[in-house]
């Protein structure tokens, strides 16, 4: 942010781990005023996710337990990535080369194979090991200091839409839009995603102009 916009707050758009990492900035008090808005797709705040699980297990209901069970099944790969050595070998010995085929079979998306896919996937495993369990078991209280838009693919194989249904306690200015799309929505529905981002950014900027006009900004 300091490099691309040192004097003006920025609009952040992120997906998957980019979104998970961006939540850190959007909920970090030291970053307040640097981020104008945040559009998140298929990448929840890990602290919010930890509280989501905790709340449903502490005050169990049939619906809540079903949501926990469904998300636990969707998160199968997270458990795999906690194992030593094995997931890294899977990426380097075959998963990297098979990635385009997997996306085509699971999501109907055509992507080209690229150099570095295997090493990127192997390094990505470290993100899960370093961040997932500490935040899920010991979640912090993290409130967003910027308007947040959630783009929710209802056919996401890894992130349940239910994970984003209780975020009003963490986000004061929240917009949530569901799409009939899979996890890789930026690849499968780029126009719809771009349109949602444009509309949200314009809305936030209009609200900012109105607040400044009233002497509130």
Model-assigned labels for residue ranges:
Residues 1-13, 20-174:
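Flexible "cap/lid" subdomain of the alpha/beta-hydrolase fold that forms the substrate-access gate
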Residues 172-217:
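Catalytic active-site module of serine/aspartate enzymes centered on a nucleophile-bearing elbow/loop
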Residues 18-19, 186:
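Short active-site segment of divalent metal-dependent hydrolases/proteases
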């Amino acid at each position: 942010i300091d490099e691309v916009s040192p004097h003006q707050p920025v609009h952040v758009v992120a997906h998957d781990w980019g979104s998970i990492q961006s939540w850190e900035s959007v909920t970090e008090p030291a970053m307040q005023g640097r981020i104008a808005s945040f559009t998140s797709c298929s990448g929840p705040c890990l602290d919010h996710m930890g509280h989501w699980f905790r709340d449903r297990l502490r005050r169990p209901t049939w619906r809540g337990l079903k949501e926990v069970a469904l998300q636990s099944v969707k998160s199968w790969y997270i458990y795999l990535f906690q194992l030593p050595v094995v997931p890294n070998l899977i990426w380097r010995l075959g998963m990297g080369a098979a990635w385009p085929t997997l996306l085509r079979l699971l999501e109907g998306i055509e992507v080209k194979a690229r150099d570095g896919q295997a090493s990127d996937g192997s390094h990505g495993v470290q993100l899960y090991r370093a961040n997932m369990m500490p935040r899920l078991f010991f979640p912090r209280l993290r409130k967003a200091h910027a308007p947040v838009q959630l783009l929710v693919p209802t056919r996401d194989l890894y992130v349940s839409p239910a994970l984003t249904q209780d975020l009003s306690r963490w986000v004061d200015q929240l917009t949530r839009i569901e799409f009939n799309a899979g996890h890789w929505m930026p690849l499968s529905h780029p126009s719809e995603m771009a349109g949602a981002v444009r509309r949200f950014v314009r809305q936030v900027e209009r609200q900012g102009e109105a607040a400044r006009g009233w002497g509130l900004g």
